[in-house]
Amino acid sequence: MSILVKMPLNLAFLNFNAANKIKKNFPDVKNWYIGGHSNGGQFAAVHVSKYYKDYKGLILLASISSFKDLSKIDIKALSIIGSEDGIVKMDIYKRYKKNLPKDLTEYIIPGGCHSYFGMYGLQKKDGTSNITNVEQIEFAADKISEFIN
């Protein structure tokens, strides 16, 4: 089961603890993962910094953990970013990678960009992708499935 949470104004920081309510609505679910794309991933990381014992893993898509240092938290993490991401540039990603949990699985999608983790069109200032939107989503979905299973 996957649950997508609609954020107010599409901004995760306006409701980054929404997962607590969702977990209460599904008490039979024992293995929770949390994640997000871009700022959604950043605020999933903020949430995990406080509630890490509630989760099996953290999934970051074109995202960083610049607000919280998760390196000492006992949780596994998956980070996927495109090599052509123009929003979370590689130097920024590498600078904040040290904040991610030690149990980190990382993939850099050759030719992938920031916008292609979704189907919302291209963001201003994003890089030029060398793969299709569908190829990037399929790559990410496969890696997430492997990570969870």
Language model regions located:
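Alpha/beta-hydrolase active-site loop
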Residues: 8-29, 34, 46
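Conserved alpha/beta-hydrolase "nucleophile elbow" surrounding the catalytic nucleophile
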Residues: 32-41, 82
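Short glycine-enriched nucleophile-adjacent loop
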Residues: 41-52
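A conserved short beta-strand
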Residues: 53-65, 76
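Short beta-strand/loop motif that positions the catalytic acidic residue
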Residues: 73, 79-81
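Acidic catalytic loop of the alpha/beta-hydrolase fold
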Residues: 84-88, 114-115
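Short alpha-helix in the alpha/beta-hydrolase fold that links the catalytic acid
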Residues: 88-98
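C-terminal catalytic-base region of ester-bond hydrolases, centering on the histidine
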Residues: 96-149
